[in-house]
A protein has these predicted regions:
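Membrane-anchoring hydrophobic helices of lipid-metabolizing enzymes
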Residues: 1-88, 99-103, 114, 132
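Catalytic core of membrane glycerolipid acyltransferases/transacylases, capturing the structured
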Residues: 88-143
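A cross-family acyltransferase "interaction/gating" segment
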Residues: 161, 172-258
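Generic beta-sheet signal
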Residues: 120-122, 165, 201-203
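A structural motif
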Residues: 156-168
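Gly/Ser/Thr-rich loops at beta-strand to alpha-helix junctions
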Residues: 94-98, 170-171, 206
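C-terminal/domain-terminus segments
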Residues: 255-278
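Short, flexible loop segments at the rims of nucleotide/cofactor-binding pockets, characterized by
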Residues: 52, 65-70, 138-144, 176-177
């Protein structure tokens, strides 16, 4: 979504989606009807109205305005599990692809202040200027893996509490239901080396079935391009009136967890399993 966002540099106008403008710039030969079709797919008009309503909010204020406008009911439990001291990593499953991050920013920004939370995201999302104050870029598309690692390292070495989706991708429908893919071990290793405590977060929500069907058919047809990602903006709009249930689970010392389960991938999988355990 973020690659199709334009923003008035004077910040006298809200962030707005402009599919046709981006296509004219990046692929000038594409017919106008294709641009109009894509604008409908991402629900450009509805998103732009939502962004106008949220303007001029930023950070957690922007996020709360989005949730309020969409009439999202956020039910939170497990607050008592959040430690009062230390630098924390809020590691959550990633069921939605947009509103889950917005909701966590709203909740944790209100609790700690925006200046005390940091959310590593791929550098494309840095186009979402109202959230630049809490985002920090990791170069997912960089030539070298160490560029990505350095962005994460800066986030973990800083003083703020880290919000992260260890899977890196939106949950998919599988034999066990809607579940994250493998949680990358990097978040756990960096939490351990920087002396952080992990707070696993269970985020109960889902996209519409058509999103999961598209992902399944793309995989069956061996299409390498992540087509379903183009439908995530529409899923955000379709969430109007829904209820999200968020549970903060008991904290885990990253260093102690790795000592008990020294294989990093298995240790990351164990924390993922905590999120889905009942």
């Amino acid at each position: 979504m973020s690659d199709t966002l334009r923003y008035c540099e004077t910040q006298s106008a809200p962030l707005q989606l402009d599919v046709a403008g981006i296509l004219r710039k990046r692929a000038p030969g594409i017919p106008g009807f294709v641009a109009r079709l894509l604008a409908r797919i991402v629900r450009q008009d509805e998103l732009n109205r939502l962004l106008r309503v949220a303007f001029p909010g930023a950070g957690s204020d922007f996020s709360r305005r989005i949730l309020r406008e969409l009439d999202i009911d956020v039910q939170v439990s497990g607050i008592e599990n959040i430690p009062d001291n230390g630098r924390l990593v809020f590691a959550s499953n990633h069921p939605l692809g947009g509103l889950d991050g917005i909701t966590l920013i709203a909740l944790l920004g209100e609790r700690y202040g925006d200046e005390n939370i940091i959310f590593p995201v791929n550098d494309m999302l840095m186009h979402v200027r109202p959230l630049q104050g809490v985002f920090t870029p990791i170069n997912k598309y960089g030539r070298q893996g160490r560029e990505r690692a350095s962005g994460l390292q800066r986030a973990f070495e800083g003083g703020g509490h880290v919000i992260i989706f260890p899977a890196g991708l939106v949950s998919r429908l599988g034999p066990e239901g809607i579940r994250d893919l493998e949680w990358k071990k990097t978040f756990l290793a960096m939490a351990a080396t920087t002396g952080r405590t992990i707070v696993p977060v269970r985020f109960e929500a889902r996209n519409r079935m058509r999103f999961y069907r598209l992902a399944r058919w793309r995989k069956r047809l061996r299409i390498p391009v992540n087509l379903e990602q183009a439908f995530l903006p529409a899923e955000l709009c379709a969430a109007r009136g829904r209820t999200f249930r968020i549970t903060f689970l008991p904290p885990v010392s990253a260093a102690a967890h790795l000592d008990a389960c020294p294989a990093p991938r298995a240790a990351a999988r164990a924390i993922r399993d905590m999120v889905y355990a009942r």
